[in-house]
């Protein structure tokens, strides 16, 4: 997924730019830190107030502190197609999911902050239209400073997630001027509409379009499941793995056992990459 090759001007780079615009979204973004025998994957703290105003100074300081920390390993993320993200389930085979998950550690502070904002978006339990607008504005500025393939991928993905939140929660209802949102994740729109449908139709449609058994069972408690994995595998890895996140619309996949297994394996044993798109 990542390499040290530089793009030559012309057709190759144009083709890559087209690939970035496809409906592929960075998901399940967490900050990964290791210290002694402890590995922790956690959401980025909420650097915003109740009105949705971003605390850019503290956010920037947090990101810069991560960059110079010997404990910081990078941001774990997975690239998902629009059709694979079914809100409560993932329509993707485990080996493909594993190949898509990376531990990303860019050398650029602006790319680091874009990852931090993505994590904040996904873990927002009660997002407001003010927060969504502030985050999008900040992402636009950060992307303009980088203007490379990774920043484009992160920007497009974050805009899609913000649009998903705005439309799913009707955050812009009654607004005089619509924001610069796109359609968001398509199956989240279906999920929202099915909540209003009669139970018979809802159950049938959910089983057809929003349910997949490819990734296996859900964990009753992600925290307890990770603790069980630690008991089983600590002797081999030498590390204890801990997961922290906020239960929100965009973090349901952390309840999947295969997601937790893959996340643990990647955080403990995966090499970092400095580029998402080579």
Curated annotation (Swiss-Prot):
Q: Which UniProt keywords apply?
A: Host cytoplasm, Host Golgi apparatus, Virion, Virion tegument
Source species, please? Answer: Epstein-Barr virus (strain B95-8) (HHV-4)
Assembly behavior: Interacts with BSRF1 tegument protein; the BBRF2-BSRF1 complexes oligomerize and might play a role in tethering the viral nucleocapsids to the host Golgi membrane during secondary envelopment.
Q: Which InterPro entries match?
A: Herpes_UL7 (IPR002600)
**Stated role:** Plays a critical role in cytoplasmic virus egress. Participates in the final step of tegumentation and envelope acquisition within the host cytoplasm.
Q: Which domain of life is it from?
A: Viruses
Q: What is this protein called?
A: Cytoplasmic envelopment protein 1
The listed locations are: Virion; Virion tegument; Host cytoplasm; Host Golgi apparatus
Q: Which GO terms describe its cellular component?
A: host cell Golgi apparatus; viral tegument
Q: What family does the Swiss-Prot or TrEMBL record give for this protein?
A: Belongs to the herpesviridae cytoplasmic envelopment protein 1 family.
Coiled-coil regions listed: none
Q: Which HAMAP family match?
A: HSV_CEP1
Q: What is its main location?
A: virion
